[in-house]
Amino acid sequence: MASEKPHMNLVIIGHVDHGKSTLVGRLLFEHGEIPQHIIDEYKKEAEEKGKATFEFAWVMDRFKEERERGVTIDLTHRKFETDKYYFTIIDAPGHRDFVKNMITGTSQADAAVLVVSAREGEGVMAQTKEHAFLARTLGVPQLIAVVNKMDATQPPYSEKRFNEVKDEITKLLTPIGFKNVPIIPLSGYKGDNIMKPSPNLSWWKGPTLMEALNALQVPAKPVDKPLRLPVEDVYSITGIGTVPVGRIETGVMKVGDKVIFMPANKAGDVKSIEMHHEPMQQAGPGDNIGFNVRGIAKNELKRGDVCGPANNPPTVVKGFTAQIVVLNHPSVIAAGYKPVFHVHTAQVACRIDEIVKTINPKDGTTLKEKPDFIKTGDIAIVKVVPDRALVIEKVSEFPQLGRFAIRDMGMTVAAGQCIDLEKA
């Protein structure tokens, strides 16, 4: 049963054209997730178009127009099972989607696979650096690096070329804080060293990609942290009373607990808890629950309030410091800009009070202190003041409540995380 194995979200990152989609296609194919007839059909189609080496990549690039252009755009979720884990692959094609999804936590990755091409003239490139730095900044806890396209080195499967690229990867990852990262030679296209050791790489004594994936650590469920449950909705049920609904992000809720909702500042007792219409005595991280609270009226709570223990209330802020990435803004952002911040289930207009500095996406160093404005592509530290009471936590303490998206003009213009705060 898939559901009994721990679940892992895996994000595939790296420079464009270094073989991410081919690797994903290969993994799915090897795990029997793609029927042979589809592979045959793709192969025939690719050959007709003169792209004989694209068969596995085409599994991911399944839209006609993408195939014509040879580009992956859709963010695709694919699943496969190993002996140990149930993986969901978050293919990260469009840089922008990737950053937005990673930051807002819609696809919080438990691990990343960094794909670097071994082909001459490729190796570690601009986007490789940027993706690695973002993975670190956004709290991806573990990383596997793969040196792909080993079949395309001169001569093929060159140990010398592997070592050159391996050194480049180590130089990139060590300063930004990724330690003990396995760096594995393979070929996504030919299938070398994916599931089993390859005679073409007889010099390689380390793990296959599969062994490295199985060696990843299970993401810890944050049960030891204080309870935090962002409210999605509130109902009043005849004969029962007020029933808030939401997903527990951290901690545990038990029947009988004294809880408080912030910023509403309303306290009550948990009388009952239900999940999927089944009563339960306690619920934990990841559980979507409805719970009845005594002592609070329906109209006293709303979406965006956060429930926590009465003796450890969720943090209401007067202002906070954030690291943001500008994803898509038509002009520039200056101090005084007031878009809507989407934090957990809350949506609150916030003013960017001050742009403290911009940051180099390759290594995290300061580019410019107090710039007048920031634009698409910039990473910056900013000071933010919400228009009304807002619960947000430091990403270092409650990552699930510290990430946000910034929306304006009907689109996500930036995303970020709270790195420091001033309590209200």
Curated annotation (Swiss-Prot):
Domain tr-type G intervals: 5-223
Catalysed reactions listed for this entry: GTP + H2O = GDP + phosphate + H(+)
Annotated stretches, region: G5: 187-189
Top EC class for this record: hydrolase
EC number: 3.6.5.3
Binding site for Mg(2+): S21
Region (G4) residue spans: 148-151
Subcellular location, record wording: Cytoplasm
Predominant subcellular localization, coarse grouping: cytoplasm
Pfam families in alphabetical order: GTP-eEF1A_C, GTP_EFTU, GTP_EFTU_D2
Keywords: Cytoplasm, Elongation factor, GTP-binding, Hydrolase, Magnesium, Metal-binding, Nucleotide-binding, Protein biosynthesis
Residue sites binding GTP per the record: 14-21, 91-95, 148-151
Region G2, annotated ranges: 70-74
Cross-referenced Gene3D superfamilies: P-loop containing nucleotide triphosphate hydrolases (3.40.50.300), Translation factors (2.40.30.10)
Region (G3): 91-94
Domain of life from the UniProt record: Archaea
Coiled coil: none
Cytoplasm recorded as keyword: yes
Record flagged with keyword Hydrolase: yes
Renumbered residue ranges of the record's region G1: 14-21
GO cellular component: cytoplasm
GO MF annotations, alphabetized: GTP binding; GTPase activity; translation elongation factor activity
Assigned protein family: Belongs to the TRAFAC class translation factor GTPase superfamily. Classic translation factor GTPase family. EF-Tu/EF-1A subfamily.
Role, per record: GTP hydrolase that promotes the GTP-dependent binding of aminoacyl-tRNA to the A-site of ribosomes during protein biosynthesis.
Protein name (record): Elongation factor 1-alpha
Source organism: Picrophilus torridus (strain ATCC 700027 / DSM 9790 / JCM 10055 / NBRC 100828 / KAW 2/3)
